[in-house]
Amino acid sequence: PLDISGDFFSEAFQITDVNQNNLSEVWILYKLGCRGGVDPLDMKIIMYENGKKYAMRGTEKIIISYNKNTKNNNYTGGKYTYDEAFLNSKDQKILEFSKKLWNKYVFTPQD
């Protein structure tokens, strides 16, 4: 059986002022997809600042195999793209924070 999954991560919900411009940023992270196969779930970070929406989209990272000789995991997924708003902002503090948030939640261990 396949399970449809939609998970918001309440611990990822944050209100910040990362770039210290006296405008709060509101961060939301969620994953969507179908469990039951080996495909990674879609993952999205949305950030609002001063009424403007910014989005980062990609997939979670999952282990697909383990090499006993090198003791390394092989992964699939984990890549992301920024929307135009993020790219046009060119705010390095915001981009760095978004990457840290992404990397904190990108990996989902499989049962």
Where are these regions (language model features)?
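Long, contiguous hydrophobic alpha-helical segments, chiefly transmembrane helices and signal peptides
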Residues: 1, 26-28, 46
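Short consensus segments that form the blades of beta-propeller domains
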Residues: 2-6, 33-39
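Beta-propeller blade termini
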Residues: 9-18
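Short, surface-exposed coil-to-beta transition loops
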Residues: 11, 27, 39-43
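Acidic/hydrophobic-patterned starts of short beta strands in beta-sheet-rich repeat architectures
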Residues: 19-31
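Extracellular/periplasmic catalytic domains that process cell-envelope and extracellular macromolecules
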Residues: 19-20, 38-40
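Short, flexible beta-strand-to-coil junctions
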Residues: 30-35, 48-50
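Acidic, small-residue rich beta-repeat scaffolds with periodic aromatic anchors
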Residues: 41-44, 48-111
